[in-house]
Amino acid sequence: MRHYEIVFMVHPDQSEQVPGMIERYSGVITAANGTIHRLEDWGRRQLAYPIQDLHKAHYVLMNVEATAESIEELETAFRFNDAVLRNMVMRTKVAVTEASPMAKARDERDSRRSPSDDRIEEESAEENAE
């Protein structure tokens, strides 16, 4: 089996269906005795250029170890799913398991947020509720 990095972009109106899509596509990989090394849901992000008059899309990244047949099946599923705007499948030499730069930036941003910020937000939410 070979290692692949898969990124697909979903129509922003279909964002609530992304967990189901991830489960379905993960099932294709695992049904063929493949392994998912990394799975990251990046959420809605700004597009570099409009696609079908859209300016945002929901991004998902997967690093998998799979057979060529299961990757072909996955690409076919992407092609026939109208909610998938774009997809890219790249073969890699080794399994990538560490967090992507996108995930690292999000974790770093979350860690920089101090507990006092949370307390201030809770207090303002309580004031707004009254």
Curated annotation (Swiss-Prot):
GO cellular component: cytosolic small ribosomal subunit
Pfam family, one: Ribosomal_S6
Record bears the keyword Ribosomal protein: yes
Disulfide bonds listed in the record: none
Transmembrane segments: none
Biased amino acid composition, Basic and acidic residues: 104-118
Listed Acidic residues bias regions: 119-130
Keyword vocabulary terms for this entry: Ribonucleoprotein, Ribosomal protein, RNA-binding, rRNA-binding
CDD domains: bS6 (cd00473)
Family: Belongs to the bacterial ribosomal protein bS6 family.
Role according to the record: Binds together with bS18 to 16S ribosomal RNA.
HAMAP family named among the record's database cross-references: Ribosomal_bS6 (MF_00360)
Protein's recorded name: Small ribosomal subunit protein bS6
Species name: Shewanella denitrificans (strain OS217 / ATCC BAA-1090 / DSM 15013)
Lineage, highest ranks first: Bacteria, Pseudomonadati, Pseudomonadota, Gammaproteobacteria, Alteromonadales
